[in-house]
């Protein structure tokens, strides 16, 4: 059955600067992916902004994006590089001229090497440094932003980088997790105040990475409790003392073993379990409703779906997933939950962090030799939904 979303619902796509722009001087530069590629040239977005702007505008009236901190600011408290500022401003002006709602993300994983070398968010001294960066972001780009994320998936950044040791700086220390969490939550609150002082009417929040975490057997009880109570619960709480909405990403269900706690599964293991899956996780669209209801009950704030998608080369599966997820989201809205926006991850295939470019989420295909973008069938499907506010049968 076809379903209709309310007038004013926000449809768009989401990207991260580090995954689409050539690496400048951030801590992901030169990282080798699981499939052997080096994190350097990603999708040449900085050279193809005009073409990419047309793609973005074809996929809805909103765009969630970040900027490369390392390109903009070359040292702590330093002035922004004027040519980079102008480059970003021209792109933002193009989006605004087309009526695009811009959600500006101030921190999406990648940090300048100078920031990392000083200890990053393991040190309280990082807080004023980050606030200074955000103050300059407001000065140069605030007029273009329609809404803000202070941090993208801070829990994912913390756990992957300081507990599981999968992201830079590859640490595995729970006490460091707590220290980084404390500093990032304080930074969030300081930046929230800064943004609301400058633009009181523009909504501010984070994007929380979510999955459905369930133990694979009775032996996984501790991992399940830890993931739900600490990761989905306590960490999220720290960023919602000051927030105008709950932003959330969702990708599937993670079956938990006793140890080690794992965030990303493998197709081989998923196939052995006999569950439907993409290249990273179990396909579990009803789970987005579980998380939405949980956050609605816990925080009582409007909910924005800041990322949702499927990692696969099977585009028919991607189309199916968009339909399935939107039906679940619509059902939650029918129950009275205030959901304002849906940003699909992602507009075009990008460099999927430590996994590499072979892990594809895009509505457009990226040829990683020529960097040419070509639309997949899912692009037309999602574009029609965004244009009509209607999900077909």
PLM regions: where:
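Non-catalytic scaffold segments within catalytic domains of secreted glycoside hydrolases
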Residues: 1-61, 70-393
């Amino acid at each position: 059955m076809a379903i209709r979303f309310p007038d004013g619902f926000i449809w768009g796509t989401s990207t991260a600067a580090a995954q689409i722009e050539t690496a400048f001087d951030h801590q992901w530069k030169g990282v080798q992916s699981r499939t052997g590629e080096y994190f350097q040239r990603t999708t040449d977005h900085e050279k193809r902004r005009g073409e990419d702007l047309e793609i973005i505008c074809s996929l809805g009236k909103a765009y969630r994006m970040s900027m490369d901190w390392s390109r903009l600011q070359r040292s702590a408290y330093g002035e922004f590089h004027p040519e980079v500022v102008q480059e970003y401003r021209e792109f933002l002006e193009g989006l605004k001229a087309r009526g695009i709602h811009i959600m500006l993300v101030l921190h999406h994983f990648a940090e300048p090497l100078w920031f990392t070398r000083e200890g990053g968010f393991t040190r309280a001294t990082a807080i004023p440094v980050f606030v200074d960066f955000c103050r300059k972001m407001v000065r140069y780009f605030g007029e273009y932003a329609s809404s803000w994320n202070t941090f993208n998936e801070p829990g994912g950044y913390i756990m992957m980088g300081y507990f599981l040791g999968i992201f830079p700086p590859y640490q595995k220390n729970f006490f460091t997790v707590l220290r980084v969490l404390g500093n990032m939550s304080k930074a969030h609150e300081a930046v929230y105040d800064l943004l609301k002082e400058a633009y009181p009417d523009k909504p501010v929040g984070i994007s929380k990475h979510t999955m459905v975490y369930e133990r694979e057997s009775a032996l996984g009880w501790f991992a399940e409790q830890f993931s739900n109570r600490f990761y989905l619960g306590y960490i999220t709480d720290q960023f919602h003392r000051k927030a105008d909405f709950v932003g959330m990403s969702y990708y599937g269900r993670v079956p938990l073993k006793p140890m080690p706690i794992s965030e990303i599964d493998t197709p081989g293991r998923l196939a052995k379990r006999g569950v439907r899956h993409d290249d990273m996780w179990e396909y579990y669209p009803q789970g987005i409703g579980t998380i939405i209801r949980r956050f609605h009950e816990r925080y009582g704030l409007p909910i924005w779906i800041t990322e949702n998608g499927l990692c696969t080369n099977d585009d028919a599966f991607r189309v199916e997933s968009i339909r399935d997820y939107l039906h679940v989201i619509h059902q939650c809205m029918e129950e009275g939950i205030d959901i304002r926006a849906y940003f699909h991850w992602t507009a075009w295939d990008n460099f999927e962090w430590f996994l590499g470019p072979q892990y594809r989420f895009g509505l457009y295909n990226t040829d990683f030799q020529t960097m040419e973008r070509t639309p997949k069938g899912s692009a037309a499907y999602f574009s029609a939904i965004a244009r009509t506010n209607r999900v077909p049968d």
